[in-house]
Design a protein with these regions (language model features):
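Phosphate/NTP-binding elements of NTP-utilizing enzymes
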Residues: 1-138
Length: 138
């Protein structure tokens, strides 16, 4: 592996924006760049519909699962939205070359070969179990 390739892989691991651009062919708006690079434990967004909130959350969840193994929990207001968000995560995951093998894959969660799990749940406390993330929470 060349020094250039090592540098690119390090950039992908350290910078979710580089990962999104190079591995997912996604060009982020400025607010999405700030969100993807943020280390804040909680962020509030004031965005219009169809602005890319779910897409950005999917990229953040996938980056976390690949480069920071553990549980990545994605919580959406409804079951339908949580499934849509997870579908975006899977669409991005399946676009990565070389393919990242999955140990488990179903409608609302997957487990990567590095042991990371991505779980997408509705935010309604009546329909959610007591899953607690050990890693990042999106």
């Amino acid at each position: 592996m060349s020094a250039n390739e090592i540098g690119r892989r390090l950039a992908w691991a350290l910078d979710p924006v580089s990962f999104a651009e190079d591995k997912l062919n996604f060009v982020a708006d400025q607010w999405q760049r700030q969100l993807l690079r943020s280390r804040s434990p909680a962020i509030m967004l004031n965005c219009c519909r169809q602005s890319g909130k779910s897409t950005t959350a999917a990229i953040a969840a996938l980056h976390s699962a690949i480069y920071d193994p553990g549980l990545t929990l994605c919580v959406s207001p409804s079951l339908r939205q949580s499934r849509e968000l997870f579908a975006k995560v899977m669409l991005f995951l399946k676009s990565i070359e070389p393919v990242i093998p999955l140990e488990e894959d179903n409608k609302s969660s997957c487990e990567l070969s590095n042991g990371s799990r991505i779980v997408s749940l509705p935010g309604d406390p009546d329909t959610r179990t007591s899953t607690r993330p050990s890693g990042s929470c999106v």
